Amino acid sequence: MSIYKQRVLELRRLMKENNIDAYLILSADPHLSEYLPEYYKNRVFISGFKGSVGTVLITQEEGFLWVDGRYWLQAQKKLEGSGILLQKQDAKNTFTKWLEKNLSEDQILGIDFALLPLSLQKDLKINCKANLKHIDLISPLWKDRPTLPQEKIYEHELEYCSYSRKEKLALVRQKMKNLNVTSHLISSLDDIAWLTNLRGNDVNYNPVFLSHLLILEDKALLFVDQKKVNSELEKKLNLDGFWLKNYDEIIMELEKLANTNLLIEPSKMTALLINSLDKSVKIIQEINPSTHLKAAKNTKEIAHIQDAMIEDGVALCKFFAWLEEAIENKELISELDIDVKASEFRAQSKYYISDSFATIAGFNENAAYPHYKATKESFAYLKKDGLLLIDSGGQYKNGTTDITRVVPIGKANAEQIHDYTLVLKAHIAISSAIFPKDIAMPLLDAITRAPLWKEQIDYIHGTGHGVGYFLNVHEGPQVLSYLSPVLEKTKAKEGMLTSIEPGIYKVGKWGIRLENLVIHTKVENPKNKDFGEFLYFKPVTLCPFEISCIDTKMLDEKEKEWLNNYHKEVFEKLSPKLGDYPKALVWLEKRTKAIF
């Protein structure tokens, strides 16, 4: 019997003992983070599925895992023998719709409220007939559960920061005043790290630390494991108006609040915290002020980001030169080797801290899984002709990077060249766009996809996401996807850092995705001044596209001009840094030649 099937049976026993008819297991921690500490990987524990997102529901008779289109193929394989069935999540098939349809008023739905988004609790109360019960049934089963992270917290040096934490706190308090609120609770780790100018190592790839922050009129309380903060840093925090409390004291402190207007962002707040509040507390639901403040990078941050992109670009030139030579020498290279070597070259930078996410290195048919991850148990060697997709990034003191490139192993065939060029056309289409400031970002996605739609091709993931500044590689509020709702918070603002990553995925054949990071930049000297401000996307990623995979007949003159200008900039910024690396310089020179 599968270990996961055994765990499901044990869970059902606990459900029966506690009169629970259905138990919902979310991919979440108390901060609703994208990447979770090992301690909070409940969904992985019960199902074995390690994708970045997914929701498990267990009843006495059935078990389901809902995942979106990125993970359908991967999840189908992993769930074999677990007794958990794959549910292909889309707009019509969600776990909330299943609960609404299948649970009755006399049944009880168990959920750990410490991991339940407040917004989801509200939705379930409205649409799910069953009674909700706060209960943790995973902890009793998980005997060898990892401990909570104990990594030290450190300062992000002021030379890299846009403002001091004292200044940032004042900016947030001004926003609070504008909203007529006297207290503000933040649980999202990137917001807290940005506001305090602190960083940590509690979550893989994201330099954040487990904490909550309660901002009052006269002080700010930082709830954190105090063993992670040395006495010198604590003194600095006190001088700037931040006072430490133990991480697990948050509920007790919230219970003390009374007769205050409390600002929260419901999509970034768990039900357990808000359910602990006194009835006299008036809750004001708005996006965290810090989210908009950190999303719009200022000129100082943008300058540092551009420096980080040079560091990353140099590492990539060295990496691709190594790969080219290894293939020419017929070395046996695996997808796992790609991951290791990319990290090795990035680590040569004095600014490097870590990778910014788990590298995706997929060869041929493996790249058809948009979020494929090679493992020691399942990986491919680069043995034959084909396409290798590499999606990788780094965390540097002066910025966060995220880039995807596709390179041929051997010689690309005509169909592969066609698909590569089509994705490049989509990439250039949105990269060349000029658009009104404050437009809802999801509306821009059609510009990207238009070249693909002309050939009745589409891809199942978003085109772009926000990126943090030495913070989370996936950051809001902007999102570039027509599948996302058009909301006030998704407006395009000057200074935002966003990814552009269209793709084509052909199951059993290959996957092609081409990704740059871009800065939302104001159009200077506009042709017309009567219609408000306009923005465009300025690429900051520095790495050439693969000209051997481009069918120049498919590109018009403006597309060629964009590509040549981009490659010219890449060469001019990277070549001076490669004087001591002749092989990397030769690799760069070959791929930045103008096309006609």
Regions found by a protein language model. Name each.
Residues 1-596:
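Active-site neighborhoods and metal-handling regions in enzymes and metal-associated proteins
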